[in-house]
Amino acid sequence: MKNTKLLLAIATSAALLTGCQNTHGIDTNMAISSGLNAYKAATLSDADAKAIANQGCAEMDSGNQVASKSSKYGKRLAKIAKALGNNINGTPVNYKVYMTSDVNAWAMANGCVRVYSGLMDMMNDNEIEGVLGHELGHVALGHSLAEMKASYAIVAARDAISATSGVASQLSRSQLGDIAEGAINAKYSRDKESEADDFSFDLLKKRGISTQGLVGSFETLASLDGGRTQSMFDSHPPSTERAQHIRDRIASGK
């Protein structure tokens, strides 16, 4: 019933817009497309979104060089993963390193956490713990799930895919790759980024890990501002502000 009402509302809005095409600068086709995207995202179940994340992550892994567990990167990440834990709010977490000079790290709704060797070359283990704690925050707080649904909706609208149960099995490798890329390149709001920062701080404290690494990670990333173009925090709030927020939390003991 909820889905029927939602679709009816979108259809009604679309009909009204069609009658006043391009009025007041509104692009009717874009508005209708946005409405359909919203509907597709709203009707995709959490289970299906995580199933898509499972396959999307596998597709990303197949397209990247993954560091072996015996490599220096694999050994470092194993130590970091042990410190952070392999479960976040009931979601199993798996960690891997991509061998690339890009500076990035991300997590999907299914607990798939990936960090790039370019980032590990720039930071010590404690700083990487802070960064990955932030990415785990997006998973725990539902941000990653919402972005997976939104990314699916865009591809589903483009390729006319229905949001039926078990939709993950209908997707091609190309579609899975597009959805995964859209989800991991999502531009979160300032509030969501701040929430993930605070989650990381709290997680580090809970796990007995130094929170100073979170400050250090922001300071390192701040040095990239205006420099290297492919940085994981290109779309995030200024790193200097975030570092100061964590310093304030450390000073207050809260």
From Swiss-Prot:
Cellular compartment(s): Cell inner membrane
GO cellular component annotations of the record: membrane; plasma membrane
A molecular function GO annotation: metallopeptidase activity
Signal peptide: 1-19
GO BP, sorted A to Z: proteolysis involved in protein catabolic process
Lipid-bearing positions (S-diacylglycerol cysteine): C20
Protein's UniProt name: Metalloprotease YcaL
Lineage: Bacteria, Pseudomonadati, Pseudomonadota, Gammaproteobacteria, Enterobacterales
Gene: ycaL
